Amino acid sequence: MEISTALMILSAITAYFLWLTFISRCLKGPRVWPILGSLPGLIENCERMHDWISDNLRACSGTYQTCICAIPFLAKKQGLVTVTCDPRNLEHILKNRFDNYPKGPTWQAVFHDLLGQGIFNSDGDTWLFQRKTAALEFTTRTLRQAMARWVNRAIKLRFLPILENARLGSEPIDLQDLLLRLTFDNICGLTFGKDPRTCAPGLPVNTFAVAFDRATEASLQRFILPEILWKFKRWLRLGLEVSLTRSLVQVDNYLSEIITTRKEEMMTQHNNGKHHDDLLSRFIKKKESYSDETLQRVALNFILAGRDTSSVALSWFFWLITQHPAIEDKILREICTVLVETRGDDVALWTDEPLSCEELDRLVFLKAALSETLRLYPSVPEDSKRAVKDDVLPDGTFVPAGSSITYSIYSAGRMKSTWGEDCLEFKPERWISQSDGGRFINHDPFKFVAFNAGPRICLGKDLAYLQMKSIASAVLLRHRLTVVTGHKVEQKMSLTLFMKYGLLVNVHERDLTAIAADLRECKSNVVNDGVGNGVSS
């Protein structure tokens, strides 16, 4: 009996390792270990996860498959993960077969307590209805004007004074933290018309901002942990699950008060002539009757989408230009050239007010530099979907129903096959047409996926560029930034590509005298050439 049992166990082990050998040969990508699948490799490279994924994708021509659970009957379904950055596959997943690749139940369960069935956490008809409603608002000129108004006021009254105080005091400042505060204030103003004033002298603590951060952090931890584990922790009220519950109560109370007050104001606005142009008020005005809970989730979804993305992109942008002074000079000259034409030669007038929308629209090279930043350091480096039905990707990869698919936005911007041999270089010129008068090139959205693509492409893309260009131009005109000596700039491994240790910078005064003199000389030469060419007899 003991011998037969031993033989059965030995046969089972032998059969398992034969199966493991077979499955390992079928899956190209990181090594698959017994039971644990590719998790050991993931854990070993957790501090450089995005680059590790990129390395694997380069070695596998843009697509690989692995399993995170090397157990028969699971490895080719629930445990299988397809990872890709091939533009053909991205177009297939995000556009052509959009309905077959929803966010899926795992993603929705993780963020449900925070985002509910909001636009960024829903699929199907629920998502489509909210998307259509929001799309109508994001295409209006008044929303762009409202965004410009919030951004310019915050830049002038709070952001720039903080930078100036840091310069005068010769004290380093964490630019990433400051940008997070600024964009949080801006998106709150645009979303529900109230300024939490987190970006203010002294950098005050705001209870809503703190509660929102804690709720987001707790939700992200769920994404990392196995579903059964975080649900068990929630049931026992352990760790960040307790913090999530408390934070959500604070967030809900804060937003509930705003919604109640706003509805009362809107009922009397015809009498006092007061007008609200924030997103919350626009949704309240809709013919459809939204519950207060739905309005809260709408607001939270837009805040989550609009805060981190722009601030993270700007942090990497400012770091990159400190490493590339020639590009910084080119951006600055473009800004000054526009201001000479719109405000004249007086340098004092250039810094009197933040740039207008019309002036910002002319900053083609700045937009190119921001786009190049997002190509190399996308705010959301990886995203995932769940396959509803069996499918075959354009490159021939079979994707079984029930399996996960990760599309690497970070890797998509770093492939030689897509961007050329210089794909790892910071080169804004790749976004400028050399044969069409310096026009900005809108690259294929399935090559440049920083704003997503297909039906879920970012609605706030233009507003994001508006905000980033406003902030970047305001800083560059007034200050020169240098990274504090010895400060480490590393990626933080999270759903958003934060800098792990922030971005500590020293703030110096910007001297525009030389640029102004050069521009005046160029202007004078153009005038003289024009006069000379126009003389005839």
From Swiss-Prot:
Matches recorded under Pfam families: p450
Catalytic activity: an organic molecule + reduced [NADPH--hemoprotein reductase] + O2 = an alcohol + oxidized [NADPH--hemoprotein reductase] + H2O + H(+)
Tissue specificity remark: Expressed in leaves, stems, flowers and siliques. Expressed at low levels in roots.
Record's bilayer topology term: Single-pass membrane protein
Binding of heme, residues: 458
One GO CC term on file: membrane
Residues annotated as transmembrane: 3-23
Induction: Induced by abscisic acid (ABA) and auxin. Down-regulated by wounding.
Observed phenotype of the null mutant: Organ fusion between rosette leaves and in inflorescences.
Record GO biological process: fatty acid metabolic process; lipid biosynthetic process; seed coat development
E.C. number(s) listed in UniProt: 1.14.14.1
Keywords: Heme, Iron, Membrane, Metal-binding, Monooxygenase, Oxidoreductase, Transmembrane, Transmembrane helix
Family as reported in the entry's similarity comment: Belongs to the cytochrome P450 family.
Protein name from the UniProt record: Cytochrome P450 86A8
Organism expressing this protein natively: Arabidopsis thaliana (Mouse-ear cress)
Underlying gene: CYP86A8
